[in-house]
Swiss-Prot record:
Primary location recorded for the protein, binned into one broad class: cytoplasm
Function: Contributes to the efficiency of the cell division process by stabilizing the polymeric form of the cell division protein FtsZ. Acts by promoting interactions between FtsZ protofilaments and suppressing the GTPase activity of FtsZ.
Protein name, entry field: Cell division protein ZapC
Pfam families per the UniProt record, alphabetical: ZapC_C, ZapC_N
Keyword Cell cycle: yes
InterPro entries for the chain: ZapC, ZapC_C, ZapC_N
Domain of life of the native organism: Bacteria
Record flagged with keyword Cell cycle: yes
Family: Belongs to the ZapC family.
Subunit description: Interacts directly with FtsZ.
HAMAP family linked to this entry: ZapC
Length: 180
């Protein structure tokens, strides 16, 4: 089980073009954040802070109910912490998702549902804004945005709140197979 440590540190790895987290004992975690998605401070050495540890706990607890292996849950948790701290501010890309017609207000760490004509899926809220939030894809197989674009597991996108619904409703919206 992965536990945050004050010995962890963030740095940018030029050869891979990715933000890395040094976990100590010669263990490294490569995030899914490339240089074009990072704020300027990500290109220098950064300690793993108390805020990072708090975000780690928040995201890990929220993801604990999902049917993911411990390894995949830890991976997603670290992707979320990295994006929360180092992802560049971006404009919403809500046109990829159907409107729900609601004025839903998600909170950080909450699981939400997004859908379009191709699929529906779970996302975790990384940063909750007034009208839009940065969310990360929780679907292991990714999420199709269009016929030619997709989000991979752990990839972040900013979406207007009127496209989101609570994940608690997802069970009623998902098709079920009757067995027996």
């Amino acid at each position: 089980m992965l536990k945050p440590s004050d010995k962890w540190s963030w740095y940018f790895d030029k050869p891979s073009g990715r933000l890395m987290l040094d976990l100590g004992d010669r263990y490294l975690f490569q995030t899914n954040l490339s240089d074009k998605l990072l704020v300027d401070c990500a290109f220098s050495y950064n300690d793993f802070t108390v805020d990072d540890a708090s975000a780690f706990q928040t995201f890990k607890e929220c993801l604990s109910s999902l049917d993911l292996s411990e390894y995949r849950r830890d991976e997603l948790t670290l992707y979320c912490v990295a994006a929360k701290r180092f992802h560049k501010p971006v404009q919403p890309k809500s046109w990829f998702f159907h409107s729900t017609g609601s004025d839903y207000q998600p909170s950080e760490g909450e699981l939400v549902q997004l859908q379009n004509g191709l699929n529906q899926g779970l996302f975790i809220v990384l940063e909750a804004g007034d009208n839009a939030s940065l969310v990360s894809c929780v679907e292991l197989e990714g999420f199709m945005l269009s016929g030619s674009k997709s989000l991979s597991y752990g990839e972040a996108i900013k979406v207007m709140h009127d496209r989101m619904s609570t994940a608690a409703r997802m069970n009623t919206l998902m098709p079920m197979a009757l067995v027996g």
